[in-house]
Amino acid sequence: MSGVEAEVIRTERLVLVPQRVEHAREMADVLSDPALHTFIGGAPATADELRSRYARMAAGPADPAESWCNWVIRLREGEENPGQGPLTGTVQATISPAVPGESGPGSWLVAEIAWVVGSAFQGRGIASEAARGLVGWLVRHPVRDIAAHVHPGHAASGAVARAAGLEPTDEWHDGEVRWVRRGAR
């Protein structure tokens, strides 16, 4: 395992909370709009399907060199109840060694990130703020290079990637453009 585990991340308006199986019911409602699947495919998951998915995620990857870090995005509701607002979406990072099989001094980690915000919460900068918070958290850990894959027709996700400090490359994967943030070497 890369040794990196999800921790609470706070931003100005959000709290990114490590995802738990118990979040599935509320997240099924948040992610229930079929329009969310326009670029990623599939259909909205039921609460039971999300519970199963979240349980698999919590179990971790088969590759012990990888870490799966998953968060739900919660709105902060005032200073008296920070972190008590509604869930609005998710962010995730798959973290692995930059060179497979290498760890220890001189090695570094890379991360593939993704995000989704429920339709009812879009257009408020939530995805951009969450992605910036995630990238900031990753670079405070030994993660040097960060990448995301964005459908070329999804301008909003491109804007989120750019806001998080990623830049588009000429690389494509499964019909999506690879965006990267390269750290210092």
Model-inferred region functions:
Residues M1-A120, R132-W137, H141, D145, ...:
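GNAT-family acyltransferases
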Residues A120-Q122, G153-H154:
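Short Gly/Pro-enriched loop/turn and capping motifs at secondary-structure junctions
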Residues G125-S128:
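Glycine-rich acyl-CoA binding loop
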Residues A148-G158:
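Conserved beta-strand-loop-alpha-helix junction that forms the acyl-donor binding cleft
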Residues A161:
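Conserved active-site tyrosine of GNAT-family acetyltransferases
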